[in-house]
Amino acid sequence: MNTIEVDEFKFLEVSTNPNILISLKGEKNFCELNLSDKSNFLKTNFGLYRYSEFEQVHGVLIDGLDTSEKNEFDGFITKEKNHAFAIKTADCIPLVMWDDKEELLCGLHCGWKGLQQGIIGKALEKRS
């Protein structure tokens, strides 16, 4: 794993195919940027044309499988390229799964409520 520093922001590169980065605390904190600034930063520095983050509610709704009028999701599933997704965590587990054959990326915010309600199984069913 490599540490990447851009304009005093720090990231940990977990994977290069697919490209998975974790924002770390640096001189500047990526999480403190507003949505528009995050999107512009990722486009300028990483060539990503779209950025999505959700209102995480410790549930089982997954963007790409479910709909939510309030943008309340605890995960995403996509085949879309050059699209960054946020998974915000404190004491929950960020789980990222990649299906190389299907080129399907899934990211889940796994709190105890979502785990108890089967968020991982729900995401894996989509892959089948």
Stretches with model-predicted labels:
Residues M1-S128:
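Active-site microenvironment for binding and transforming phosphate-containing groups
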